Amino acid sequence: MRSASIGYQCPECASDSTPVIRGISKNSFIPNQENNQATKFLSITLISIYVAQFVLGDILISNFALFAPSVSTGQWWRLITAGFLHGSILHLLFNVYILWVIGSQLESIVGNVKFIIIYFLSLLGGSLASYWFSPFGSYSIGASGAIFGLMGAMLVVGRKKRLDISQIAVLVILNVVIGFVLSGIDWRAHLGGLAAGSLIAWVLLNATWLKEKNQQ
């Protein structure tokens, strides 16, 4: 079983709390809770499903994890449902923590609808990358593709809005490197989610900019 946890953070980030703009602080690990309903819902959902896993045993893994042979026979839902399963309590907590911190910030900037679009397309992008490039008979679970997508989106949005994104960039780099160094981590899902989230955020931002420009 391969899990794709996000389990590390930037140790320097806790020492500086100087505010920047739009609720983003130099300490990128303080969430903005002004408009994070979708983040709350997703966090509660991930925790609730893990409780169900604990109660039901391996039945959810067997039927909903990303397993390429099953996907290839038509069980396409696994590309999404795998992102709601976790291999351990630490796997879950790491992903929920990053979801809460990065997701709350991103959602407060782009809004609920765009945030949800970014989350689910990042999840799908990570799953597709894992499906296409991982060994054919391997299992993969975890929200990490979506989480990496949120981090990629935050980099794109932050740069567009001239925010301090240095600490998020460090977080992304650290976790990408860790994915290659440690065994049992689905780095393909990480990179797929990161690419998808960055691309979707760029498209959404530019679509909004073009719409506003045409209305002037």
Could you describe each region identified by the protein language model?
Residues 2-216:
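A detector for small-residue-rich transmembrane helices and their helix-helix packing motifs
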